[in-house]
Regions:
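Conserved protein kinase catalytic core
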Residues: 109, 165-166, 277, 295-297
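Short small-residue beta-strand/loop micro-motif enriched in glycine and branched aliphatics
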Residues: 110-112, 165-170, 287
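Short alpha-helix boundary/capping segments
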Residues: 116-120, 171-182, 294-297
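Short pocket-lining segment of the protein kinase catalytic domain that shapes the ATP-binding cleft
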Residues: 156-164
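Active-site Asp-x-Gly
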Residues: 267, 279-301
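Catalytic-loop signature of eukaryotic-like protein kinases
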Residues: 271, 275-278
Length: 301
């Protein structure tokens, strides 16, 4: 039941909640710049810390034991990624994974700061821990272990989609209409699975609206600064329409995001560019990198 003072109380509560989220983001960012070993975790922080005992526990669903795991490639970026080639104590089983993908704490303090402030690692670990099982096998890689701690320290043990014929795409790749249609089918399945889900008030409470995401206020501030810098720079000959739009967005960005939140709520991937997708031999399409997921109308994807 509403009371005559609700219109006064709600903005205050929202402001306090926003301040708390920004405070948490700053604490996370502060922890991120510390040397990795200074913040203890109950899990390996990097692929180099992963040993056979840890992997055997993560892969205990399989009726065999690992006898070796060696890196066969990897990249560093927003997170560190290493592909491991696996050797098992049994050669008579065809369904054992031959590789896994380790996604872990960024080696760069700069990248850790961004990942920590925006809770990107926590988002992805919780997605695989709580939400992944509600989706079909094509939507995302299978996850064997998901851990996240303070200051962007995290580690995921993921299926290597290449082992089932998956083809990760790059931003510069060309696709055809069939790939685009398959992506729409994947997004439809994702959004339908969590459409107005009561789980958003339960185990999926971490899937917040965009404006409630940790660090989002800091992100908007950064975007404003970039637009302001572009507007003041003589280096770019910006058309009048672009200048007017940049000024409008700078003045109204919070209201714009509030308007974009209107409508039926579901879980969205939040970063559906081509480089976060992969194709499968049957023509279906899946999604990688679930760090930016949030709750919104499905059209935002």
């Amino acid at each position: 039941m509403s009371t005559p003072t609700d219109h006064l109380v709600r903005p205050i509560v929202a402001g306090l909640s926003g301040t708390a989220r920004t405070g948490r983001a700053l604490v996370e960012a502060a922890a991120a710049v510390l040397p990795l070993a200074w913040v203890p975790t109950p899990f390996p922080r990097t692929a180099a810390d992963v040993d056979l005992d840890f992997l055997n526990r993560a892969l205990s669903r399989f009726p065999a034991r690992l006898v070796d795991a060696r890196p066969v490639g990897g990249t560093n970026g927003t997170t560190d990624r290493v592909r491991l080639e696996l050797a098992w104590n049994r050669d008579d089983l065809d369904d054992l994974p031959r590789h896994v993908f380790i996604k872990s704490t960024p080696s760069s303090a700069k990248n850790r700061t961004m990942v920590a402030a925006l809770a990107l690692a926590r988002n992805e670990a919780l997605f695989y821990e709580r939400a992944r099982s509600a989706l079909g096998p094509r939507i995302a890689p299978e996850c064997f272990a998901a851990h996240a701690g303070l200051g962007a320290r995290h580690l995921l043990v993921l299926e290597d989609i290449a082992d089932r014929g998956g083809d990760p795409m790059a931003l510069c790749d060309d696709i055809d209409a069939a790939y685009a249609r398959a992506m729409m089918a994947t997004l439809g399945e994702l959004h339908a699975a969590f459409w107005e889900s009561p789980r958003f008030r339960g185990d999926l409470r971490f899937v917040r609206s965009e404006r409630e995401r940790p660090g989002f206020a800091l992100l908007l501030r950064q975007f404003r600064q970039v637009r302001t810098k572009l507007l003041k720079s003589d280096e770019y000959d910006l058309p009048r329409e672009v200048r007017e739009m940049a000024e409008f967005v700078n003045a109204n960005d919070w209201a714009l995001h509030a308007n974009w939140e209107r409508g039926p709520q579901t879980l969205i991937h939040g970063d559906t560019h081509l480089g976060n997708s992969f194709g499968l031999p049957d023509g279906s399409v899946g999604l990688l990198d679930w760090q930016v997921l949030y709750r919104a109308p499905g059209l935002r994807d």
